[in-house]
């Protein structure tokens, strides 16, 4: 589950500016 979210964040970090 975490890998899926990390992959999405790397592809579209704009979606999760939490980082």
UniProtKB/Swiss-Prot annotation:
Organism of this sequence: Clostridium pasteurianum
Reactions catalysed according to its record: acetoacetate + H(+) = acetone + CO2
Protein family membership: Belongs to the ADC family.
Protein name from the UniProt record: Acetoacetate decarboxylase
GO molecular function: acetoacetate decarboxylase activity
Function: Catalyzes the conversion of acetoacetate to acetone and carbon dioxide.
Keywords: Decarboxylase, Lyase
EC number: 4.1.1.4
Domain of life: Bacteria
């Amino acid at each position: 589950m975490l890998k899926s979210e990390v992959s999405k964040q790397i592809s579209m970090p704009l979606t999760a500016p939490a980082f």
